Amino acid sequence: MNEIGLSLDTVWMLLAAMLVFWMQPGFALCEAGFTRSKNTANILMKNFVDFMFGSLLFFFLGFGFMFGSEGAGFIGMPNWGDLSFYKGDLPVEGFLIFETVFCATSATIVSGAMAERTKFSMYVIYSAAISLFIYPIEGHWTWGGGWLCNDAADSFMMSTFGDVFHDFAGSAIVHSVGGVLALIGAIALGPRVGKYDEKGNSKAIPGHSLTLASLGVFILWLGWFGFNPGSQLAASGEVNRIAISHVFLTTNLAAAAGGVATMFLTWLKYGKPSLSLTLNGVLAGLVGITAGCDLVSPWGAVIIGLVCGIVLVYAIEFIDHKLHIDDPVGASSVHGVCGILGTIMTGLLSVSNGAFYGHGWGFFGAECFGVLVIDLWAAACGVVLFFGIKKLHGLRVDKRIEEEGLDVYEHGEMCYN
């Protein structure tokens, strides 16, 4: 590769990393807006924890666990902060930063589902565990060259499905993992005080600022233009410039379709279009398209967005009203359900090897198997982590602290005075 092309690719990767980093304040504002004002400082602090601890731990060990060895292994070799093992064309420091912001995204998804009742000290522990072990290990199976993406003729995936698992930017690897962990964490915590009456009926606990939540979603939408197109990791040459342009388009179309689908469904279902659910509908479309944004057509992206936007509404209702799991921001539905759904639909709608384009069911099977394995890993880790913390030290704050707000009791300060 010539120097100019490699330099352009490096600059694009770093710009994309900056956009993905910008998703952190997007998540922070979205979560803060969907929760009550007495917990805002706690929400913001947890989002800082995700990136601060994630940056250090992923540099020290997580990067090695994810990329430290090639082949069909379970986990890469630890690097202990030594980056010399990496042999790619792009500068290793830049690639590390790009992967770090993805790792932090997976960790921060969990925060919203466990909002308003989690001990801050325990949040630090499980945020660190996600960045150090949970995300890097399943990341090694996929983006790290592990067994789910091993395309050797005699590999398990090729001999079983005739194709490998594909997740271009992380519908499963990042989002469904975060969503499954969020669901397990919310189950371990239990619902907020006053969320369900004595008959088990769900009672709405409105957030304090749809303005903040709306701004957060707009910022996330912007950040996704680094999250998905940036995963091409190149911008030089005709192939790459066409690829990132295509991914930009499919990403935007899915987001718009998800929001439109949710808006009209809530209008029909509840008599009025819901802003809060429409915001989550946009995110549902973004999460859903992330796996196959490089493989599906623009119309395929619209279909994925529409389906995710519709399914989102029923998923939130089912988790809240039927399962009685209290997820204040809908993270388990947006990232978990729609991450899984988007990955599966990639197996159907991929132009190059999807079942609906006459290429057989092998790739669809690979997508279903891959997301199943990844999320079973996340669920198993979540059960051990959250229920282990709950038994050993306690995961939840006292009732009085929850009722009066975590800001003062956990941090000694409030966002609003």
Segment roles from a protein language model:
Residues 1-417:
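Glycine- and aromatic-enriched membrane alpha-helices
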